[in-house]
Amino acid sequence: MTYCSKANQPSYPFILPDLPYDKESFKPHFTRETFDYHHGKHHNSYVQNLNNLIKDREELQKKDLEEIIEWSSQNAEVAILNNASQIWNHTFFWYSIKPHGGGKPSGKVFEQISKDFGSFEQFCAQFKQEAVGQFGSGWTWVVYHDNKLQIIKTSNAGTPIVNFMKPILACDVWEHAYYIDYRNKRSDYIDIFIRHMINWKFVEDNLIQ
């Protein structure tokens, strides 16, 4: 099963994927510098680390990224798991946002949110509570699991796909995602994420696939 074809990569050597938008396009909410560091340095370092970790592991070089995540999670290969997961998580995150995004969704996503959370406002409140409340670095996710939407948190490089949960939205709450522009104000960052950044088309595509 492929959880997200846009986040997956077919085989070694893995590459840093291009951003699906210009780095300047999130102004005034985020500066180019944030994307230069977040994508060009942090995300890229995970790609380089994983390639170095498996450069002599022919059995792993034939696997796609999601297969490496699954295999390493089952075989206590922590360094491989952490770097592979962070490549996948970040790529999924880049598609979870778009310039001039956010606001209220429509269609199937809005219907499912209303069904599972009571209202869009309640969903936003719970999402913000979970994201702001994540202790230390990690991720906040919306997943479709057990026939309903759920908001979950993962610490550090954790990813829901190791628990066979289907992610439909990711929010990076590592400090490097927002510290250049928002310093320690994670709450402000989450407000901007919800109001101006969520790519609801990507969310809907994940939900209905």
Curated annotation (Swiss-Prot):
The keyword Metal-binding applies. Destroys superoxide anion radicals which are normally produced within the cells and which are toxic to biological systems. Catalyzes the dismutation of superoxide anion radicals into O2 and H2O2 by successive reduction and oxidation of the transition metal ion at the active site. Belongs to the iron/manganese superoxide dismutase family. Its cofactor is Mn(2+); Fe(3+). This is Superoxide dismutase [Mn/Fe]. Its EC number is 1.15.1.1. PANTHER family: SUPEROXIDE DISMUTASE, SUPEROXIDE DISMUTASE [FE] 2, CHLOROPLASTIC. Keywords: Iron, Manganese, Metal-binding, Oxidoreductase. It catalyses: 2 superoxide + 2 H(+) = H2O2 + O2. It holds the Pfam family Sod_Fe_C. It comes from the Bacteria. Binds 1 Mn(2+) or Fe(3+) ion per subunit. GO terms for molecular function: metal ion binding; superoxide dismutase activity. Mn(2+) binds at residues 38, 90, 172, 176. Fe(3+) binds at residues 38, 90, 172, 176.
